[in-house]
């Protein structure tokens, strides 16, 4: 994959995974826009999902990654935005298939 600009966000349950994913993608040469959250304090996941979807809609980012406790809340919130198609991806094969449909 060529280098992309990727917006990423999580709620408090996904901070550690978000940080790992961000670091990996950055090492691979992608530009990361990290919308938080940045600690384990309880937050409302829809606030963070909207930051990422707004970046995609306004073409600030090529892709978005949303992480929460189950992934469901972020995906549901993202899919409420016109033009956004979010998929719950829990392994590499599912992520690849979500991009091919």
Label every PLM stretch briefly.
Residues 1, 56-60, 99-101:
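Solvent-exposed alpha-helices and their adjacent loops that cap or buttress functional pockets
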């Amino acid at each position: 994959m060529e280098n992309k600009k990727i917006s990423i966000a999580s709620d408090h349950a996904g901070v550690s995974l978000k940080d790992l994913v961000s670091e990996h993608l950055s090492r691979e040469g992608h530009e990361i826009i990290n919308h938080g959250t940045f600690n384990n304090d309880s937050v409302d996941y829809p606030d963070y999902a909207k930051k990422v979807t707004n970046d995609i809609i306004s073409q600030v980012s090529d892709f978005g990654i949303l992480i929460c406790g189950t992934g469901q809340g972020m995906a549901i919130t993202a899919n409420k935005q016109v033009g956004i198609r979010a998929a719950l991806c829990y392994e590499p094969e599912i992520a690849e298939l979500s991009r091919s449909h």
